[in-house]
């Protein structure tokens, strides 16, 4: 069983691997917007 304190951070751990993907996607969109302008 997980500790109660860890249960609070469980959603954060679920989101953590997605952050670099979102950052890469954001950078790609910015580059595309600047490139097409």
UniProtKB/Swiss-Prot annotation:
Transmembrane region(s): 16-30
Location in the cell: Cellular thylakoid membrane
Membrane topology: Single-pass membrane protein
Note accompanying the cofactor annotation: PSII binds multiple chlorophylls, carotenoids and specific lipids.
Cysteine-cysteine disulfides: none
Biological role: One of the components of the core complex of photosystem II (PSII). PSII is a light-driven water:plastoquinone oxidoreductase that uses light energy to abstract electrons from H(2)O, generating O(2) and a proton gradient subsequently used for ATP formation. It consists of a core antenna complex that captures photons, and an electron transfer chain that converts photonic excitation into a charge separation.
This protein's name: Photosystem II reaction center protein K
The species this protein was found in: Thermostichus vulcanus
């Amino acid at each position: 069983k997980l500790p109660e304190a860890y249960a609070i951070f469980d959603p954060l751990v679920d989101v953590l691997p997605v952050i670099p993907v979102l950052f890469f996607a954001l950078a790609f969109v910015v580059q595309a917007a600047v490139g097409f302008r």
